[in-house]
């Protein structure tokens, strides 16, 4: 995930022999925040991140999440859809239609969710940073919305496993792996 994290922070490849601190400074990225995200994503146990509150840049995290949304919605989801359509091409048409529709509904839910984060959650967090608290909103509202997306991807997995009658299960297995590796990375709850 290091390369993906770098791109989400706006760090391009080709930085030579520079260390992480130098690369972060050169790109205007908070090094503590960068390392916290990398360490969190590469840990086997996703425990709450501690002892970093003094150096973590919330604005850098918001930028990271915004760039992750852009990548996921404009590159990764369309790529997964193409791969899924290829995997189900030999299915009976009615089964392929249901699977495609379900994926498209999932993608639409993810799009709505990420749009909600961009329009509601990120401004809410920025307001908190400025000392402004919105009495009509709190982060538990966001958590409830997150759980719905996770359930949708689990339903898609169950449909594919139970009802996929087509040949070539290697391609479908690859699609399932990609969907879960990618989607759960983007839709799993943020650390509390």
Residue spans for each PLM region:
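A general alpha-helix detector
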Residues: 19-22, 60-61, 105, 179-182
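An amphipathic alpha-helical core segment
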Residues: 130-183
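Membrane-cytosol interface segments
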Residues: 1-45
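Charged, well-structured binding/catalytic surfaces in domain cores that contact anionic ligands
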Residues: 68-149
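Short, charged/polar, low-complexity loop and linker segments
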Residues: 51-58, 88-99, 167-177
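Hydrophobic/aromatic-rich structural module bridging two neighboring secondary-structure elements via a short loop
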Residues: 38-69
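Conserved small/polar residues in nucleotide/adenosyl-binding loops
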Residues: 186-191
């Amino acid at each position: 995930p290091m390369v993906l994290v770098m791109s989400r922070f706006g760090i391009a490849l080709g930085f030579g022999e520079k260390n992480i601190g130098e690369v972060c400074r050169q790109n205007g990225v908070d090094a503590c925040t960068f390392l916290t995200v990398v360490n969190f994503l590469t840990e086997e146990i996703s425990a709450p991140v501690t002892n970093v509150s003094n150096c973590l840049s919330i604005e850098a995290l918001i930028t990271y999440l915004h760039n992750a949304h852009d990548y996921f919605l404009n590159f990764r989801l369309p790529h997964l859809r193409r791969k899924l359509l290829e995997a189900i091409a030999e299915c009976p048409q009615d089964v392929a239609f249901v699977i495609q529709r379900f994926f498209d509904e999932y993608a639409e839910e993810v799009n709505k969710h990420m749009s909600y984060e961009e329009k509601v959650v990120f401004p809410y967090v920025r307001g908190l940073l400025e000392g402004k608290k919105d009495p009509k909103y709190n982060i538990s509202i966001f958590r409830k919305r997150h759980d719905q997306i996770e359930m949708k991807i689990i339903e898609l997995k169950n449909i594919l496993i139970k009802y996929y009658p087509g040949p070539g299960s290697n391609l479908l297995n690859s699609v399932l792996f990609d969907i879960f590796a990618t989607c759960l990375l983007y839709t799993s709850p943020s650390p509390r």
